[in-house]
Amino acid sequence: MPKLSLLKQDGTNAGEITLNDTVFGIEPNEKVVVDVILSQRASLRQGTHKVKNRSEVRGGGRKPWRQKGTGRARQGSIRSPQWRGGGVVFGPTPRSYAYKLPKKVRRLAIKSILSSKVNEEKLVVLEGLTFDAPKTKEFAAFLKNISVDTKALIVVAGESENVELSARNLQGITVIPAESISVLEVAKHDKLIITKAAVEKVEEVLA
């Protein structure tokens, strides 16, 4: 089972924590991780693109010239697709790009990316993380204490308003509750900082 140092908020050592092998110690499956990231990114697409077909373009109700006798090609409407300003054939319409992957695949992906962070020594476990008031300066000092100077995802147990507000103005820092942890969020950040209570919640769901 993976063992990591447990850090206090001031960066000092608070002992060791043993992580669940089935969540943080599996052989990472990169293919599954990529599949889930693509699925989650597809779900974020708005899909609001829209063009007008010939029935939606304004005008074109009258036949532009008579059928025969003019020497010109027959036309039924000035809004048919070959005309300038005409309707579009087979153009994009509003749609959802979301698609679901099996639950087993999604669970394997989150376990894989968590295990990758452990293997790459990019997972930091905290004894706890609390702030009496929203203070960006204090949060920046905390990051310095634990030697984090890159993009970091901070996972806490449940909602923590003071922590979220303290981190809001720091570029590259995201705070989420343990229930919202996702493959895409973990992949977007270089380091994963997670509290001991959040580890227990994640293990409870995934183990």
Swiss-Prot record:
Encoding gene (name): rplD
Keywords, alphabetical: Ribonucleoprotein, Ribosomal protein, RNA-binding, rRNA-binding
Role, per record: One of the primary rRNA binding proteins, this protein initially binds near the 5'-end of the 23S rRNA. It is important during the early stages of 50S assembly. It makes multiple contacts with different domains of the 23S rRNA in the assembled 50S subunit and ribosome.
GO cellular component: ribonucleoprotein complex; ribosome
Protein name: Large ribosomal subunit protein uL4
Organism encoding this protein: Listeria monocytogenes serovar 1/2a (strain ATCC BAA-679 / EGD-e)
Region annotation Disordered: where it falls in the sequence: 47-78
Family listed: Belongs to the universal ribosomal protein uL4 family.
Biological-process GO terms, alphabetical: translation
InterPro entries from the UniProt entry: Ribosomal_uL4, Ribosomal_uL4-like, Ribosomal_uL4_dom_sf
Highest taxon of the lineage: Bacteria
Residue stretches in coiled coil: none
Biased amino acid composition, Basic residues: 60-71
Keyword Transmembrane helix found: no
PANTHER family, per database record: 50S RIBOSOMAL PROTEIN L4, LARGE RIBOSOMAL SUBUNIT PROTEIN UL4M
GO molecular function, one term: rRNA binding
Assembly mode: Part of the 50S ribosomal subunit.
